[in-house]
Amino acid sequence: MSERDAVVGIIGLGAMGRPMAEHLLAARGELHLSGRSRRHRDLEERGATWASSPRELAASADVVVSMLPDLPQLEAALDGPEGMLAAGRPLLLLVASTSSPTGVRALAERLASSDARVRVVDCPVSGGVDGATAGTLSIMLGGTDADAAEAARILAPCGTPVHLGPLGAGQVAKAANQLVVGATMLAIAEATVLAERSGIDVDRLWTLLAGGYAGSNLLRSNHRRLVDEDYAPGGLARYMVKDLGFAADVASATSTHPSLLPALRDAYAELVDAGHGDDDLSVARRFVAER
């Protein structure tokens, strides 16, 4: 079966999953959907098929992309009488959530030791809602050569997939990515507050600095949020606590002794404790200002 002939489904149609589903549907002409509620009838009008349960999704799809928040939600969708495993069909499972590398490997081992005929590729994404909408996500693949190649062909409409190594490699790469993102966002937030309190127009400041070494995709995509103090959630700030925890796990497993990571974990835990966990990550500006 070619990747074009494979029937593809996606579970998890939140801020990232919904635009990814749009790109997959546009590229393939058909797509099977599953989520907590049937809120995406416009996709059905364009050719998508709604599955009322994970079991129904896996009964129709050869490949399922999971955009659920993390592994506990995915395992709940796999197990039980209405879970994907109950469909009893071979399945390529693409784990696109940010998860623990160890956890992804353990899930694959559990599935391999059972009667389930499920192959797993981890494929976390980076680029945020803007990247998901534009179809420019960075997609980090971990898995066997054959499975990762199939995953890359299927996910290509959503961005740039790159195979980085065996199962779990994608999640290690995403942990590294989140370490950079978390540090950069907090640095931008602190710089914004100290500049504003010094009487500098932060809109003009970031327009200027975006063209220098301080410029980044993160700054460009959050420029207006920082200036307008609009923290309506794109990606929830509380997820950074989870993600940095995965980075700490990788550091421990590789005998790496980071100096910045512990401080970042403390700062984002404090941000969540201050009540900002359900805001966008750019709420770091408000958090810094209120400390």
Walk through the language-model features, giving the residues of each:
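Helical "substrate-binding/catalytic lid" subdomain
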Residues: 169-291
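Rossmann-fold dinucleotide-binding core
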Residues: 8, 77, 98-179
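NAD(P)+-binding Rossmann beta1-loop-alpha1 motif at the extreme N-terminus of oxidoreductases
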Residues: 1-66, 129, 157, 162
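Hydrophobic beta-strand scaffold residues
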Residues: 31, 50, 119-121, 162, ...
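Hydrophobic residues within alpha-helices
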Residues: 20-24, 107, 194
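Rossmann-fold NAD(P) dinucleotide-binding segment
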Residues: 54-118
